[in-house]
């Protein structure tokens, strides 16, 4: 008889009172599954719990939270030796849940938890930025970064992903271009940009398809740059309706480097990183993740 897997669930503290998740955990425990639960309260907790999972010889580590929680857990898994690395599972509990939504992970707690424990384990890529920073979904820079990092927590809680668009409309005074240079294999671009997106996944900011062709197991990243040739009208048209825009520059690359005369801030799935230079590279098949058969981000 095959043993039931050992699972450690890392729960974002903001969702610690979720009754639906508590009920789903109880049901799976009654079915014989070993489920340890740990709650994060500050940055660094997830890394410590991943290390604990390895000591427990856990088969799965579940990130229960939003995109930031998923990324923090994935980054902690990526630096562990492959021989002892647990498989990542995802239970979406955040505001936007962009990565989980793109992967078509169920929003219903019992179904998501069951998938995270028993679903198909698939090797997926993650991206490394400079030394020691990672993202599983997307890095965004420019106006989009300011919006996603400055949208008030109360607005996000009340309105969900629509809060990002609403806050963007409130803060058009922040709309200014940033000069930078981007290069990678057989690619070079320089100029003024409003938004830069580097995607392992496809969407960010509450459902905006910034990198619509990205895949999470192809060993490549999708780059999308909105140049500042024309400001507000074309930006809104391209980024909020998904229509084609001549000021959009796209490329598919295994790595790229971005340099700027002034500090730029990128949002790495919720983690802000400020620098004048960024090297972003894909780490192919860096971790395994339990995903549904219909996941559209797989080759």
UniProtKB/Swiss-Prot annotation:
Cofactor(s), by name: Mg(2+); Ca(2+)
Enzyme class: transferase
Domain DAGKc: 2-133
Keyword Transcription attached: no
Assigned EC number: 2.7.1.-
GO biological-process terms attached to the record: phospholipid biosynthetic process
Catalytic machinery residues: 271 (proton acceptor)
GO cellular component, one term: plasma membrane
NCBIfam families named among the record's database cross-references: lip_kinase_YegS, PRK13054.1, YegS/Rv2252/BmrU family lipid kinase
Name by which UniProt lists this protein: Probable lipid kinase YegS-like
């Amino acid at each position: 008889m095959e043993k039931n897997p050992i699972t450690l669930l890392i729960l974002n503290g903001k969702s610690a009172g979720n009754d639906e998740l508590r009920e789903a955990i109880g049901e799976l425990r009654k079915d014989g599954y070993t489920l340890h639960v740990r709650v994060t309260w500050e940055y660094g907790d997830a890394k410590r719990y991943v290390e604990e999972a390895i000591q427990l010889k856990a088969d799965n580590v579940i990130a229960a939270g939003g995109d930031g929680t998923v990324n923090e857990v994935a980054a902690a898994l990526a630096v562990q030796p492959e021989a002892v690395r647990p498989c990542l599972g995802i239970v979406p509990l955040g505001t936007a849940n962009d990565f989980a939504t793109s992967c078509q992970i169920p929003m219903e707690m019992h179904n998501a938890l069951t998938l995270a424990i028993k679903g198909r384990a698939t090797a997926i890529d993650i991206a490394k930025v400079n030394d020691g920073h990672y993202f599983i979904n997307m890095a965004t820079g420019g106006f989009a970064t300011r919006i996603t990092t400055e949208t008030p927590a109360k607005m996000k809680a009340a309105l969900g992903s629509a809060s990002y668009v609403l806050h963007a409309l409130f803060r058009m005074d922040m709309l200014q271009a940033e000069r930078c240079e981007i290069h990678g294999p057989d690619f070079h671009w320089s100029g003024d940009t409003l938004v830069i997106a580097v995607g392992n996944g496809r969407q960010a900011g509450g459902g905006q398809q910034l990198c619509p062709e990205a895949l999470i197991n192809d060993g490549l990243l999708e780059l999308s740059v909105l140049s500042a040739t024309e400001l507000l009208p074309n930006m809104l048209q391209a980024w909020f309706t998904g229509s084609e825009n001549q000021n959009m520059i796209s490329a598919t690359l295994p790595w790229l480097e971005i340099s700027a005369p002034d500090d730029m801030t990128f949002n790495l799935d919720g983690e802000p990183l400020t620098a004048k230079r960024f090297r972003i590279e894909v780490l192919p098949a860096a971790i395994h993740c339990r995903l549904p058969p219909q996941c559209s981000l797989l080759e």
